[in-house]
Amino acid sequence: GTTLLRDLLRLHPHLECPEETHFFRWPDPYASPRFMHPYTQNKFIKKQREMDGISEQEFIHLIETSNSRSELAEAYGNLFLKKQNNPHGRWFDKTPQNIYGILLISRLMPDSRFIHIHRNPLNVVASLLQGKVLSATGITDAISYWCEAMVIMNEYKRIAAYRVLEVSYEHLTSDPLGSMITILEFLEEDPDDYVLPDKFVHGEHNKYLDTLSEQQIKEVKQRCRPYYSMYGYE
């Protein structure tokens, strides 16, 4: 769902999004060896920077001149805007694992806003078990991806609900324009500047019906409580 939302947001002329930055993904202290390792050694992350048009030399300079995750993120985002020839635009990050760093993001980037896109856990689990984008080794960790994110988000909403907009993947795909108008208003971006091409979004296909057994479906529904019903999937 984050990729679709990213693609929809980037249709607005003021909004730009790099590939997933992962700057708030891991809990290790900023600039520590364990924090730095994936950014210097992970081929996938380095490839994403290449796709953003940011060279290794440029990234090293950003690291050397940043004293925190937020400084690095801001510097990276601003450089990316220049690479996109949109220096006065606004950048955002779609890294799904930002959920694990939401408290740090919230404190270090006080003007940030969060869009929580949620999807029927049955389809999430089915997708993770297929492993085309992100994979799970079994149904337990597949369910945990959904449940742990829900726990964190609902606890965060108790602190700063006004900074969060929750968007249903199912509603986004059934009424993309209406959903995007709501999202853009939340972000204080002008919906009049937004144009959605025809057939840009396809509806939810409920692939879990062809992927999960009856027992697995029952297990997902049971273990995803109470959020399964709270979010209208009952």
Question: What residue ranges belong to the model's regions?
Answer:
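Surface-exposed cleft-lining segments at the edges of enzyme active sites
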Residues: 63, 86-91, 129-141
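PAPS/PAP-binding and catalytic site of the sulfotransferase fold
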Residues: 1-15, 101-109, 120, 165-191
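Short, solvent-exposed loop/turn segments at secondary-structure junctions
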Residues: 22-24, 97-99, 120-123, 130-131, ...
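PAPS-dependent sulfation machinery
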Residues: 16-94, 98-99, 228
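PAPS-dependent sulfotransferases, especially Golgi type II membrane carbohydrate sulfotransferases
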Residues: 30, 129-132, 136-137, 147-150, ...
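Conserved phosphate-donor/acceptor-positioning beta-strand/loop module used by diverse small-molecule
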Residues: 94-95, 104-129
